[in-house]
Amino acid sequence: MSELNDLLTTRELQRWRLILGEAAETTLCGLDDNARQIDHALEWLYGRDPERLQRGERSGGLGGSNLTTPEWINSIHTLFPQQVIERLESDAVLRYGIEDVVTNLDVLERMQPSESLLRAVLHTKHLMNPEVLAAARRIVCQVVEEIMARLAKEVRQAFSGVRDRRRRSFIPLARNFDFKSTLRANLQHWHPQHGKLYIESPRFNSRIKRQSEQWQLVLLVDQSGSMVDSVIHSAVMAACLWQLPGIRTHLVAFDTSVVDLTADVADPVELLMKVQLGGGTNIASAVEYGRQLIEQPAKSVIILVSDFYEGGSSSLLTHQVKKCVQSGIKVLGLAALDSTATPCYDRDTAQALVNVGAQIAAMTPGELASWLAENLQS
């Protein structure tokens, strides 16, 4: 082992010691003050892992267990980069159920607003007293504003129109740049000696405005705890679509009951604070409710955001979706609507819905905006 110590720097040895744990300290090396603080912070959180306890490993090594939650929050904000902080805070709430991370006012105000923290707040807001809830609302507002700014741009771009390569535009927008026409128009500016083509007259395409008048859009959102990312993005997406002319947007949340949140769709913060995560699911009743909202089936879309694990009757769900499709309603089932579009869903139920005419996919919000722009044609 002395040969290994000769090959590795002290910092590298300390990194291996942090990875391997306290048992490796005598073999590798001790920790300096900074590394020991890192070890304390990591041990405070991950020392409570059930698998470690089953193996007989003690938790909270080297004094880490003596940290209070506020002290732990302060320490990780000093010791780690932002990406690691968000992961640690998320694991504390969602993996280990350390609820005072988001129910303690001092701790909550110290935490960095992020989507991970937003998820944690939505899972635990029912435990918060009014003062903590007010602080949580400010966090929700900040994170939602950041998501809204990003998604609103994607929605506007999707509905701005398709490029018309036959018509020239004199408005210089990068996304409308016509590469081939620009080459043809500037061939006379080719310099053989320099081996370069100088662009003096760039060309741009115009766009054909998409028509989306008099469409009705119903978003049915599963409130299962596993769907929290999709709930967040559905709320923000609905607010973005609400601002578009010619689209009437409804947002309905469901578990075993159905709650129409359309009155709050323009305010995604208020909407998210009303969502109740967890519980069972009765998807069929949500689809039936959505179908009853429709006024002109041929000008309507129902988007069902769910993992398709039906707590009620799967055959009744299939029947309700079939009735929607047969009436002329476009039905899109989304197993995930978030930034990664990584689904986990009941494939048998999803296939049954495909068999009666629904489309099933997992999409990012930008992909959903593009899908809607293509399908909402008058």
Curated annotation (Swiss-Prot):
<dbReference type="InterPro" id="IPR036465">
    <property type="entry name" value="vWFA_dom_sf"/>
</dbReference>
<protein>
    <recommendedName>
        <fullName>Uncharacterized protein YehP</fullName>
    </recommendedName>
</protein>
<dbReference type="Pfam" id="PF05762">
    <property type="entry name" value="VWA_CoxE"/>
</dbReference>
<dbReference type="InterPro" id="IPR008912">
    <property type="entry name" value="Uncharacterised_CoxE"/>
</dbReference>
<dbReference type="InterPro" id="IPR050458">
    <property type="entry name" value="LolB"/>
</dbReference>
<dbReference type="GO" id="GO:0071978">
    <property type="term" value="P:bacterial-type flagellum-dependent swarming motility"/>
</dbReference>
<dbReference type="InterPro" id="IPR002035">
    <property type="entry name" value="VWF_A"/>
</dbReference>
